[in-house]
Amino acid sequence: MPRDKSENHEKIVEAAYEEFMTYGFNEASMRRIASNCQMSASGLYKHFSSKEDMFASLVEPAYQGLKEKYNKILDEEYKDIKNKSAEDIWEGDEETVWVTKYIYDNYNAFKLLVCKSQGTAYENFIHELASMEEMATIEYIEKLKENGIKTNPIPKKELHLFVTSNINAIFETVVHDFSKKEAIAYAKRLDEYCVAGWKRIFGLSE
C-alpha cells in the first residue's frame, strides 16, 4: 500500500492507472510510470514497494468495499426470511442493480479488475465472488428449509456453474463499456431474468 502521501502521489496514481489500462499488469512498467511523472524509478518506490503494491492500491479499496456491502445485505436477507413466503423469495431484492451501481461508482477500479488484472492476485476475483455467492446461496436455501419452505435439490457442480455465469453477466457491462445508465437498465432486466430462473430451478415458482 502507498507509503508516502506527498503532493506527487495523485500524479503517480493517475499515471499508474493509465499505464495499467494501456499495457495491462504484466506489461506495465514502473520506469515508464516514473518517467510520465517526471521522477526517477527509485523515487516511485518511496510511494509503492512494488508494481503489485501499486495495482492493489488502485483496486483493493473498491473490491473490499463490495464484499463488505454484500455481506451486510446478506445478513439482512437472512433475518428477513421468516417474513417471506415461497412466492416472495428473491422478489424485489434487485441485487444486481445495487452491485452495478457500486461498480459504476468505483468504475476505474473495476475496469482494472475486470480487464487488466491478469498476473495479479486479483485475476480470479470473479471466481472468488462466485464462491462467496455459492456458499451464501447454499446457506440461504438451508435457512428456507428451516422455515418450512421446501426447495428442489440442485447438484453442487451445477450450482457453481449457474452462480459463476450470473456473476460474469454482471461484469460484462464493464467489458463492453456500457454507460452507467445503460448498465443499470441492463441490471434490472438481468435481475428479472435471474430471479425467474432461480425460482424455477429451486421449485419456488409455479
What residue spans do the PLM features occupy?
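Hydrophobic/aromatic-rich alpha-helical bundle segments in the mid-to-C-terminal region
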Residues: 141-194, 202-206
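Alpha-helical DNA-contacting segments of helix-turn-helix folds
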Residues: 56-62, 125
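Amphipathic alpha-helical packing segments from all-alpha helical-bundle domains
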Residues: 95-105, 120-146, 157-164
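Short, basic, alpha-helical segments at the C-terminal edge of helix-turn-helix-like DNA-binding modules
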Residues: 30, 60-67, 74
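Helix-turn-helix
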Residues: 11, 15, 19-53, 57
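Secondary-structure edge/capping motif, primarily at the C-terminal ends of alpha-helices
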Residues: 73, 77-81, 110-117, 144, ...
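Hydrophobic alpha-helical connector segments
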Residues: 57, 71-102
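C-terminal/domain-terminus segments
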Residues: 17, 113-130, 182-198
